[in-house]
Swiss-Prot record:
Glycans are attached at residues 59, 79, 116, 151, 165, 323, 514, 682, 700, 719, 765, 947, 1196. The active site is at 396 (proton acceptor 1), 525 (proton donor 1), 994 (proton acceptor 2), 1123 (proton donor 2). Zn(2+) 1 binds at residues 395, 399, 423. Belongs to the peptidase M2 family. This is Angiotensin-converting enzyme. GO terms for cellular component: cytoplasm; endosome; external side of plasma membrane; extracellular exosome; extracellular region; extracellular space; lysosome; plasma membrane. Changing residue 993 to K: Abolishes peptidase activity but no effect on GPIase activity. Chloride 2 binds at residues 796, 1095, 1099. CDD domains: M2_ACE (cd06461).
Amino acid sequence: MGAASGQRGRWPLSPPLLMLSLLVLLLQPSPAPALDPGLQPGNFSPDEAGAQLFAESYNSSAEVVMFQSTVASWAHDTNITEENARRQEEAALVSQEFAEVWGKKAKELYESIWQNFTDSKLRRIIGSIRTLGPANLPLAQRQQYNSLLSNMSRIYSTGKVCFPNKTATCWSLDPELTNILASSRSYAKLLFAWEGWHDAVGIPLKPLYQDFTAISNEAYRQDDFSDTGAFWRSWYESPSFEESLEHIYHQLEPLYLNLHAYVRRALHRRYGDKYVNLRGPIPAHLLGDMWAQSWENIYDMVVPFPDKPNLDVTSTMVQKGWNATHMFRVSEEFFTSLGLSPMPPEFWAESMLEKPTDGREVVCHASAWDFYNRKDFRIKQCTRVTMEQLATVHHEMGHVQYYLQYKDLHVSLRRGANPGFHEAIGDVLALSVSTPAHLHKIGLLDHVTNDIESDINYLLKMALEKIAFLPFGYLVDQWRWGVFSGRTPPSRYNFDWWYLRTKYQGICPPVARNETHFDAGAKFHIPNVTPYIRYFVSFVLQFQFHQALCKEAGHQGPLHQCDIYQSAQAGAKLKQVLQAGCSRPWQEVLKDLVGSDALDAKALLEYFQPVSQWLEEQNQRNGEVLGWPENQWRPPLPDNYPEGIDLETDEAKADRFVEEYDRTAQVLLNEYAEANWQYNTNITIEGSKILLEKSTEVSNHTLKYGTRAKTFDVSNFQNSSIKRIIKKLQNLDRAVLPPKELEEYNQILLDMETTYSLSNICYTNGTCMPLEPDLTNMMATSRKYEELLWAWKSWRDKVGRAILPFFPKYVEFSNKIAKLNGYTDAGDSWRSLYESDNLEQDLEKLYQELQPLYLNLHAYVRRSLHRHYGSEYINLDGPIPAHLLGNMWAQTWSNIYDLVAPFPSAPNIDATEAMIKQGWTPRRIFKEADNFFTSLGLLPVPPEFWNKSMLEKPTDGREVVCHPSAWDFYNGKDFRIKQCTSVNMEDLVIAHHEMGHIQYFMQYKDLPVTFREGANPGFHEAIGDIMALSVSTPKHLYSLNLLSTEGSGYEYDINFLMKMALDKIAFIPFSYLIDQWRWRVFDGSITKENYNQEWWSLRLKYQGLCPPVPRSQGDFDPGSKFHVPANVPYVRYFVSFIIQFQFHEALCRAAGHTGPLHKCDIYQSKEAGKLLADAMKLGYSKPWPEAMKLITGQPNMSASAMMNYFKPLTEWLVTENRRHGETLGWPEYNWAPNTARAEGSTAESNRVNFLGLYLEPQQARVGQWVLLFLGVALLVATVGLAHRLYNIRNHHSLRRPHRGPQFGSEVELRHS
């Protein structure tokens, strides 16, 4: 009833077991139909002569009953309906009654004498008839038994697996699930099919199987068997049967272990460490078959020599138009070529050779049928045109040939010599059919290649079918015998099943299984009560048969090359075996054929000897572990399981898709960049319309290709670049929104950025000032408290309040985009760019490492401002008013250097005056930046840069976005900068920053467009700033003739480091808090009612700043910072400010610099340039730690280089602050300057000023309690900090920082 592929047929059983296998009844008991009196036993004498007449009478009656029962079973199995089940029930009950009356009669007449009969065939006949099996049971119990068989068969045959959340798409075992297991290489899809089938079928079968076991045992005990398993084993007529099998299994085990190790290695190459453990069992769903019993369907993954001709001829069969009928005709012709019988007309007229297309439910499991009328023999098979099925066809035709040859024997002898014989016959022929020589003869192989590599390919393919099956063929009945005997109780059904499967097969369940599952039931033979050890026996026998028949056919050479096609001698020898049926002991029949009466694995081992040796050599060469010592290992579940199962896993298709995306994206992104540039350099309504159109085109393209990207499962791709590109494309970003919402979102973004860019503030006389350059210059140069306050407040009142109405909807859309792309909120989406699960913790550690230096800088600057503005406006124990630090956002403080210079009499280190005096222009600034990069051996900017960039603010009246930005036009040659450059040292530094972006663009321009980004966003920000660290050194400014001296001495160094700290250290808390605020807005912990209050809470907490005038919830001060309305994440700048010092330290080392880090200038160092270029060339193609390692030699972000750079200044600040008795921090956190109090007193009488916010008294009281707690914590922290700094001072250095992430610099990145 089938061989190892799981597509197996029926073999003729003894009448009781035959009837058992035919019983399929309705759920509810019904009255038993009466047996026709003409079929009842008559009167016979109780002697051997009477027994002969009894046997003859039984034979004629049995043929009638068995024909009727088989017809009913056939009708049901080829059309599963309630009516057919009812008719089958009636026929089955008749069969049982027949077995009962004849069996009891045999016992009554011959029980004491039958074993002494002289006629051996008669002994076998009477012995068979007297075994009643289920017919021993009383009617009610018999009906219960039949009902269990019926329901188990129905559950298995109608089981389906439905696609998750799509009830309309359901898969049957055959062909859908079978095809998936055979052809899919998607780990998740295979898992879903495997788990779905085992759950759908196994779980409901368990209680039925438990009941079946109890009733079946009860029935066979009445026939003097200890349990059902003992009855099954009795067919093999050997008291040492189990021991013989164990001996044979151990003979074959080394070959299996070598095959297992080799296949496991191949699967590891495909699925990786995550899913395949080279020292563990193989997940059961990866081997090409639902039960991992034969592995030939994964031959393409394990083929030893893939350049040799393909031995899987499936594609040729399809190409040549083979169909099911033709496959059976080819098989028939093989049998007749041996002189065996052709199929009778009834076979072709009545068989079901394909799955019906008329909607009928059928039992697809392949099976061969004997109708016991000596002319009607059929096959039921849902045949698919594949090479594997061609072997199954020969297997089933082998059963039918057996039926034809023994059809004239007594019905009780119409069986194989033992059950394994019946399974072996068709497979013997399949061993010839599958040879390359035979495939060539039947037109399925163009030519036969006779060399060792082709032989190894062929033998490995055969081993995947034959050797892989052996432990499975052995263990199934090991488990059932344990169940029947009681050694395996129901509470351990599944545990023992998987114990055996791991022990013998070396496989494991791919998902957690427990005793609610019944995974044995997912195999046809368990619910259909078909013994399975026959297949193990047949796999040994068939090679013994093959060896003997090849000898008869005169074959010379290796056994695996033998083809007995057209050998009449072999056919005659085989016919003798078939015609004997089970009329003689199987040992005698075997000896007649092979010369030995014992099962023996020698012929099988001879057949596979070449590949056995090859596998051993391969495994030794690869250092494979034979076996699975880590037997408890289990694979994890895939991400997004089970939703992501129906995904494409073909890497070649993915490669073509990526190429298509890259080609089309470059064109579209170039067009979008042009439209965006036109708008940013000439803000008009017409330009905004064009930009929105192009933005929609980009979104549509992103949606189209992102949607296609989502159809790929990249988890097991071997090409890491394709994997990385597709994973990135799967994030659809804003394109995931429905068209109307996308249009609204784009409009909100455009409106917010336009509002920001076009805003200006006006005096009462009507004179108006834009942010660039007027307000920026005022904030940088004015030292008038009220003038600074007017500029600061007016900008926020004008811009922030105008942005606020858009912002809540922007947040809502941003979160919706993130969630639709699989993130928890927009903040989660932004953080994902850093590919770190610990990003927030790592950033916090870095911030904490730098906080002592910032607190010392803050205290020192506050003292200097107190000297200038007095105690009315500066509290030495409180926060600093935010408008006094030289910058609209107090993010960098270098513009107030003149107020805070440690040694004012030391030479000036600001090159602005010299630049103006020498007639520097914006173009000259960028030429010098370009020269710096080329001095390192890096690329010069192309001509397009100079022709198309906007390097200063236009004077033709155009409105432009002045915020500096670098642009990549995605054509490999057009790169531009947009900057309203002023001739000053700050803009010289910014120019180097922006040229850093351009250099990055040029270095990675040949990568796929998806990789044309920084390793992480902070990397892109850091590159230009690295150059600025060298450019800012007095040594380099002197080389540009911008300083009169290189400068030297302690005071000069401290002045220089102070100026750098006002840029770099002052910026750290600001760059950290902006996205702290936005992330909390996105996750909902900051609501729109508290936008401004929480903004100032963070600015107080991290920067130690307060608003100089009261702010209310009607204000929206975050919106006054470009990156907030422009939707540009900001933590990249924090990252870049950390990592630029790590890079600087590494490049200085490469340049051979010795001495303090702050004096290093890498100008003209080709070694430093190469180090940097190698990292930039990677773009986004590798995770950022790899790029970090290329430059610094290690993969982590760390503040140590930054601390090292500022070490002399840190020590000076600690000394200076101690000398003045400065407070570190701002314990009087609720203080506000007089301006705030004055304005606050004129406000509405029922509101009070709190932290510069204008709140209800109750709100303020709650806030005071919160801040009281913070104050106490800050006081404790301050005491600890003082102690820490004391220790630092004593040891002449700050503590080495904890290794963690890194950050970047303060200019908008526009290239994506």
